[in-house]
Amino acid sequence: MHGRLITVLLLTASSILAQNKKPLYTAPLGIEAYTFRVGFSKDPVSTLDTIQVLGFTEMEGNSAGRGADSFRLLCQARGINLISYGAGYEQLVKSPDSVAAQAKALGAKFVMCAWIPHSSLFNIDNAKKAVEDFNRVGKILKDKGLVFCYHAHGYEFQSYENGTLLDYIINNTNPKWVSFEMDIFWIRFGGGDPVALLRLYGNRWKLMHLKDLRKGAKTNASGLSTPDNDVPLGTGELDIPAILKEAKKIGIKHYFIEDESNQESIHVRQSIQYLKSLSTE
């Protein structure tokens, strides 16, 4: 009798605890199109079908070589919103109006740049030029109803004065015109702490790339890595729950799973399952 009572009480307690658990990841499921770069280069339509089947409703990327209006319709037919448009640095500097037109035709709210041209090590001269260009381009894009985000890529962690060149870029760009996308892999690879940077710069961060770094990987501030260093979320060095909690606190609403390995189809599925398994407790 007592044994049965204890069993019932334990089951009841477990049920209550399960009901009190809430999912940690509650944002729309997003994908960085570069993850399926091979598929998009061969068959964009089938690749969008795959993205739909996987459950993604948001995407960051471009028009995959098609007309913007045509690609937007293909995405919409599959319930996919292209939230962020990726543009090259030179393209942004030379033709910001053209970039804005393309982004708006695709329905994007953000324009993202992921690389500042530089030779050898990234330096203060590169950073100063980027600040000047970002402030100018960011204002143009804002006037057209878009948010410009610079995607830090790890090479910005060269020391400068009392911080790094990333600190210099963030502190010298106008918050009205320039925001940032955190790629947690590259932040860690370059020597930064994603959680600390989220806390330090708060709502300057508007977007996030979700990816994980292989345990024991050799890191540096080159901004360059090898495909084997990309692993499914939750299997690498990064504290994904802590990062997501801090990102939610500062108001990041759009997250894009990205995988630069040669096993993206397998890794993406594992990463989705991992995100769904996380709870607030």
For each feature predicted by the language model, list its residue ranges.
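Hydrophobic faces of well-ordered beta-strands that scaffold small-molecule active sites
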Residues: 27-32, 59-61, 82-87, 111-113, ...
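N-terminal pre-domain/capping segments
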Residues: 2, 18-110, 278-281
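Sec-dependent signal peptide recognition
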Residues: 2-8
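Acidic/histidine-rich catalytic cores of soluble enzymes
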Residues: 143-237
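Conserved, mostly hydrophobic/aromatic
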Residues: 31, 51, 59, 75, ...
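Active-site acidic/histidine proton-transfer and metal-coordination neighborhood
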Residues: 49, 58, 89-179, 265
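Hydrophobic h-region of N-terminal signal peptides that target proteins for export
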Residues: 10-18
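Acidic-and-aromatic substrate-binding clefts and catalytic sites of carbohydrate-active enzymes
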Residues: 37-42, 58-70, 88-95, 118-122, ...
